[in-house]
Amino acid sequence: MLNPKFVRNNPELVKTKLQTRKVDPAEVDEYLQLDQQNRDAITKVEGLKKQKNQLTEQIGQSDPQSEAGQALIQQVKQLNGDIKSTEAAQTEVNDRLHYLAIRFPNLPADDVPVGPDEDSNVEMRKHGDIPTFDFKPKAHWELGESLGILDFDRAAKVAGARFVYYKDAGALLERAVYSFMLDLHTQKQGYHEIIPPYLVNAQTMYGTGQFPKFKEDVYTVESSGMTLIPTAEVPLTNYYANEILSEDQLPTYFTAMTPCYRSEAGSAGRDTRGLIRMHQFHKVEMVKYCKPENSYDELEKLTDNAEEVLRELGLAYHVIKLSTGDTGFSSAKTYDVEVWMPEQGVYREISSCSNCLDFQARRAMIRYRKADGTVDYVHTLNGSGLAVGRTVAAILENYQQADGTVKIPKVLQPYMHGMTEIK
């Protein structure tokens, strides 16, 4: 949620920035008008209540049966009616104001490229050599099926499209990948490992910005209203919801490996085969809480934490800065890390690292007390470290051999019981 005081004091800047994120400036004008009406109503109610209190004191000092006393009583009754009608009108205004406020995305940072979609994203850097093959590389799903480690057909039989069974060395590889990631984040990068709930309530989904805008993208259990998490960002960011931290608790880093559940409502026809776009998948998530003045430095570190996983795995990648039209709802600035996929001959997203500033903290009421005693909102950041299934896909494609076998990256071999290849 945006800082209402900032919106109030910088209306043209806010309209310009939100317009780059496909928000009609007229909605900002409506918000500002309602905000003024709401504050005027609050002031009016306070004034009416003050008058009522003064009259009530006068009634207590007079004869209520006298003409003057009766007049005072009638004035109080009139004030009660005015207070009730003003509060009712204010409630209506406030409801619409809140409706707009929770649907405004975050304001993009000044250095975010302006553009309507992914075509306006900017490449920041590349790392690693793109592998060359003296044979036509196969897609990861072909390799997985021929090696007997991925079974999409039987998964479709029991759950439908966009599900998979991992088998034998495939299951071991998946487990090895996320175990390696968690060890790197916790043992080297300073993260605390969390195993969070995989079902959360609606308020928690609201806190990180998934609700109300993206309800169609998730799975909700109708009997309870609980939602299967689309990412561990949701429970990790809400860990400190409605709390005031001490300054010495910042920064705090959390990581978790969880299943993630997504309906992929807007993805019909895209990535219909393989591990790239699933309804259920594992992901290692990184979440940071920090002081406002440090959040952009923390974003650079967070992105490097994700990149380090790929460097250790020996996978080529590049980093792009997302444009205003491609940046996520809650984010002010996002880097996507994309890994090279040989069969398609393109880079594909494997991590998205975002600085949300105080946007999520305002929704989830996460604050900290400064040394001088004042209270401010923390800044929150999140990033994939990494999407596990996509990492498995990248390993299968980049480490495949001409005979259809797949070599295992050295850093994963200790997690694979010493296995050096899948055959």
UniProtKB/Swiss-Prot annotation:
GO terms for biological process: selenocysteine biosynthetic process; seryl-tRNA aminoacylation. Its EC number is 6.1.1.11. It is found in: Cytoplasm. One of its GO terms (cellular component) is cytoplasm. Keywords: Aminoacyl-tRNA synthetase, ATP-binding, Cytoplasm, Ligase, Nucleotide-binding, Protein biosynthesis. ATP binds at residues 262-264, 349-352. It is an enzyme of class 6 (ligase). One of its GO terms (molecular function) is serine-tRNA ligase activity. It holds the Pfam family tRNA-synt_2b. PROSITE patterns: AA_TRNA_LIGASE_II. Catalyzes the attachment of serine to tRNA(Ser). Is also able to aminoacylate tRNA(Sec) with serine, to form the misacylated tRNA L-seryl-tRNA(Sec), which will be further converted into selenocysteinyl-tRNA(Sec). Homodimer. The tRNA molecule binds across the dimer. PANTHER family: SERINE--TRNA LIGASE, SERYL-TRNA SYNTHETASE. This is Serine--tRNA ligase 1. It comes from Lactiplantibacillus plantarum (strain ATCC BAA-793 / NCIMB 8826 / WCFS1) (Lactobacillus plantarum).
